[in-house]
Amino acid sequence: MLKIGSHVSMSGKEMLLAASKEAVSYGANTFMIYTGAPQNTRRKPIEELNIDKGRAHMKEHGIDEIVVHAPYIINIGNTTNADTFSLGVSFLRSEIERTEAIGAKQLVLHPGAHVGAGIEAGIEKIIEGLNEVITTDQQVQIALETMAGKGSECGSRFEELAKIIDGVTHNDKLSVCFDTCHTHDAGYDIVHDFDGVLDEFDRIIGLDRLKVLHINDSKNACGSRKDRHENIGFGHIGFDALNYIVHHPQLMHVPKILETPYVGEKASAKPPYKFEIAMLRAQQFDPNVREKIVE
């Protein structure tokens, strides 16, 4: 069965219940949340996340697997600022606790940026951070995200992610989140040779570690190292390639999460997810979908 959903908001008093309601309104059977704003460390206590009602609503609507995304501000690849590194370590620990409390198994993490020290130094720092964070008894896997390679990001090559995984002691607690936009922007030809890219991933990392897919089109050409998401079918990856990935027989069990941009003028922009999910379920591109989203 196809597991497809999107990023949804966990906010207000309903929190997880609100997130589940939003996902259901899009026709989703999985979803991804941040436990608070992605750009800061302000978080409500676990008891205010409305977990029981949220889980009950999920069960009622056949949602059994969800994903949590760690905030962008975590950077355990920072070799120059000890405070940034230690904040990343402590906050990642608390995010694991929150993810476990919510009942999710995958916590997506941007591996980190080396801020000028070089990829090797960044990778060593990320390994150090993950070794500090991970415990043998945690239920959650940290899903390292494939990155576009903009700025000083680590993790845009499969070899870099493999090196991180190999360096972590309890690496059974690590998985990978494959982002289509990022991987395309990093230079992998997922448009014309997705099977070849998947084989390369399997050879270098292992397909058994691929636990989350971020399904995004890209505003930029392959190898641009930009990381700007586009709506499904309107970018350089295109509908056919993304549809092929979403329905790939080797990836049917993996939750697919859309993180595409809202459509329309900023103040009144509308989420595209209901329409994009429907297109991908039907395996049929609608060139007029953006007009329908803003109607």
Swiss-Prot record:
Family the UniProt entry places it in: Belongs to the AP endonuclease 2 family.
Organism (species): Anoxybacillus flavithermus (strain DSM 21510 / WK1)
Record keywords: DNA damage, DNA repair, Endonuclease, Hydrolase, Metal-binding, Nuclease, Zinc
Recorded catalytic activity of this chain's protein: Endonucleolytic cleavage to 5'-phosphooligonucleotide end-products
Designated name of the protein: Probable endonuclease 4
SMART domains, A to Z: AP2Ec (SM00518)
Signal peptide: none
Protein purpose: Endonuclease IV plays a role in DNA repair. It cleaves phosphodiester bonds at apurinic or apyrimidinic (AP) sites, generating a 3'-hydroxyl group and a 5'-terminal sugar phosphate.
